[in-house]
């Protein structure tokens, strides 16, 4: 079983990318569980046909400790399994703790056991804040390979670099490695070349360039992943391509984060910042 975490700055399209990738893997007959680690609890909605799933923390608050696996894990598109860790009430407590509680509960209830025949577990993690709780999947060895969703926008690249600092810190003590950058295009000038160069400087690869396409929004309005909505459109091919690239990936590295000056120089070189 491959344990994958998807990180990236808020609003970059992590949840959309994760769910569409999982749909792509499902069409390749891979058995996948998705664990949403974002307090917004929107990491599985498209796989569940638009249903808002009750989160692990909400279930615990309402039912107490007496929880069965089927209470927190729902079947989604392509025989995937869907879990949302959820978060605390706004203004109270730490969302990172919710991730820790959820993953421990899934382990105790046997969600990862061999009889489940999982090929992958995907953690979709809020990524601007590399605080201890959100870093938990990489810190405690729950995730072994990380993909960072980014774009050619400055803040997305800053966030990617910061996440690499977190990976580097925990790679020394555990087995976590960076599998690559996924460029979720924002149609920025020179975007593909810039992310390829950023990946090179980080010691990794741009594993896939996902073009920007309104079919993603059309599918979301229909509460589906692109592949489930219309598997003949070019964007469905893009997500299948990304799923295949992850499935075949063999490049796992400890990243070499950039100093802020190097990152700014990269942005200057590609015309995103004025000298």
From Swiss-Prot:
For this chain, the annotated S-S bridges are none
Fill in the PTM field for this protein. The reversible ADP-ribosylation of Arg-97 inactivates the nitrogenase reductase and regulates nitrogenase activity.
Residues where [4Fe-4S] cluster binds: 94, 131
Q: Which residues carry this modification: ADP-ribosylarginine?
A: 97
SUPFAM superfamilies reported in the protein's UniProt record: P-loop containing nucleoside triphosphate hydrolases (SSF52540)
User: Which principal EC class is assigned to this enzyme?
Assistant: oxidoreductase
The entry's family comment says:
Belongs to the NifH/BchL/ChlL family.
- What is annotated about its quaternary structure and interactions? Homodimer.
What is the annotated role of this protein in its UniProt record?
Answer: The key enzymatic reactions in nitrogen fixation are catalyzed by the nitrogenase complex, which has 2 components: the iron protein and the molybdenum-iron protein.
Q: What is this protein called?
A: Nitrogenase iron protein
Q: Which organism is it from?
A: Maridesulfovibrio salexigens (strain ATCC 14822 / DSM 2638 / NCIMB 8403 / VKM B-1763) (Desulfovibrio salexigens)
